[in-house]
Amino acid sequence: MLAFVLLVLLMSATTQDDSFFVKGLEFRPEAVKNPLRNEKQKWSGEKMLIIPSLVEESCDHDLIVTNFCKSSLSKFGIVALVPSTKNCRQYQNLGAITATTGNIVEELDKLKKGIFSKIVVINNRYDGIDLPDESCRILIMDSLPYFDSLADRYEEQACPNSELINKRIAQKIEQGIGRGVRGEKDYCAILIIGSELVRFMRSIATNKFFSPQTRKQIDIGIEIADMAKEDKTESPIKVVLSLIKQMLVRDEGWKEYYASEMDTIVEDNAESQVYDRLLKERQAEQFFCEGEYEKAISSMQRLIDGLNVDDTEKGWYLQQLARYTYPTSIAESIKIQKSAFKKNTQLLKPSTGIDYTKISYIHQDRLNNIRTYMRKFSDYGELFLSVNATLDNLSFGIEATKFEAALKDVGALLGYVSQRPDKEIRKGPDNLWCGSNDHYLLFECKSEVSGTRQEITKHEAGQMNNHCAWFEDQYGPNANVDRFMIISTKTLSYEGDFTHKVKIIRPNKLKILKDQIKGFIKELKPFSLDEI
């Protein structure tokens, strides 16, 4: 596309998605791997990253939002970046100003002119916004960003451990936290809230995708949170505010500490192979678009043969291979798609050839299962962050796929064999657990049902009945099973009936379960996970 251009120069402190340079703009991987840098300047500006939940667990998302929405502003601006309208609504209900497509220019202009009244909330805009100096001295980075396109969201759901996906998420986060520091002398306190975002920034598995500068700022944030924990005389929110005040009053101790730590940054020398993979993806797609199907197939096959990734991601590329194969052989394409689906059940299910695999507790031990789950994590901190993020997703109002994934994870945490039949074979209940003596727990999840709903509808009762019939067909009428519907109301509509005994889990009971799991995890804090 750009072959006729002799030189293209792009200038940016960060990029939201540098994979587009290779796949979209057709840049050479070498150019993206080796950007022009000012070697004399390791960092610019001052970002005080604060993770309130690390200061004290009770200093959670809702507490931060509530306190800062109530703040009266006169000397500087406070801005919150949120990923969705749902997140935005919480701020609106507390009196915040929402910057919409229609008024965002006006609201940002007010901040730059020094007109401060209330916190300003910006929805899903992580780039293209400058908030220098007093226009934003406190930036709240609220929750993990979403991808904009359905294709990107599908890829994220299908390949959650993908280096490509996690690198793009990290770049989007970096774009966001850079909004409040726009120059060498600029400074801003950045509050990181939302358990999924905190986990992504702290976890060993994903922290590595940030730039060395951001990783160092996260390390500084963890360090000051640890130091702040020692202050037992003040409430957690006051401790957080005192940290921010140190930066705002230009405390010399803080400035020296920040500068000395940032000066120790060492640039990454490890070379990522991800850009070479992007080049191969682009080449295969180009062949396919040009009708060179055999070349597309062989190009994608070479890419797959050289992969060193988990099964979920390998399945993703097999699905691409199936797509390329379809014009030349439908039968072979379906065969490849079966292989892809067996590796990753988040992908498209073939019309035939996929059988349900029953779960059983034979040769299982619940305590050993719990130990195995916990030893996936390097330490208690990693375990705690992961469980917190999972339990946050196990909440009413959360998107169904996230809720059901969280429930599956909770089952594994508690030592059950845990499965999502509806997701994995497109038939059966949302979640199924199997415990000791093959005692099954069947779940139908209605997390997106409004909290004001009065009744369980006839259609919802019918769904539950169908899933109960499916279970009996697979496991027999004498299987030991408890059936649950997770929904905000317990009243069944006049038109509806259940064919089996169904227990209802409402918000209060779900909260009790989550609190008990949190309590269980906290009991493990004094122990090494390897010794449990």
Task: Cite the ranges covered by each PLM segment.
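Conserved RecA-like P-loop NTPase helicase motor core
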Residues: K110-R199, V449-S450, F484
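Conserved RecA-like ASCE P-loop NTPase motor core of nucleic-acid helicases/translocases
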Residues: V8-A13, K75-S84, I192-I193
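Interdomain hinge/linker at the junction between the two RecA-like core domains of SF2 helicases
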Residues: A3-S71, T214, D219-I220
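Catalytic core segments in nucleotide and nucleic-acid processing enzymes
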Residues: T85, I104-E107, G114-I115, L139-S143, ...
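Conserved strand-helix element at the start of the C-terminal RecA-like helicase core
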Residues: K70-L94
